Amino acid sequence: MILYDRLINKEILEFASPSTKFFYCGKDPNKHSLPQEETNKMMVTLAKKGHTVTRLKGGDPFVFGRGGEEAEVLANHNIPFEIVPGITSGIAAPAYAGIPVTHRDFSSSVAFVTAVNKSGMDKEQYWEHLANGPETLCVYMGVKRLPEICDLLTKHGRSSETPVALVHMGTSIRQKTITGTLGNIVDKAHQIT
């Protein structure tokens, strides 16, 4: 049994045994094929019926991939599991574009952050903290909030000349990268689609 996500390369499914059953559990930004609770329930139900269950996710399951939540559910049901780490898109996509996230001369720190902040921290505090924190920010799920993110970062101290890259379809043959600065990337963002 393979429960797979939207962001995996579908060609990898061809390596599964012909008898494998596949379940799509992807989450589009505007539509979830299954609520997370249903995915969790399916993993537990299939495992308790004696099936070997693979939860196949793109990137690293513990970096904005709900892998921690899913592992917790399995542990709470005493279901043994193994985590196979992946390479998060915040590392893979910039590398594929030839952009290092750290560089001895420019950036000695990097943070992986989400534009969908549910930590309870005030939005202004969150972006002020990031504006004055690590040199490199890899922002996940931020396309729809790009103008607001750029405004908040510059408002709280990041230079409008800070280099920015937008990467679409990272590490695929359709990857597209647009570069600019915090001050002009919003105007260039239309080039990504």
Where are the predicted features?
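Short secondary-structure boundary/capping segments
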Residues: 13-14, 45, 102-103, 128-130, ...
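Cofactor-binding loop segments of dinucleotide-utilizing enzymes, especially the Rossmann-like FAD-
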Residues: 5-7, 115, 169
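Hydrophobic packing residues within well-ordered alpha-helices of enzyme cores
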Residues: 12, 74, 93-94, 149, ...
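Class I SAM-dependent methyltransferase SAM-binding "motif I" and its flanking Rossmann-like core
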Residues: 58-133, 176-184
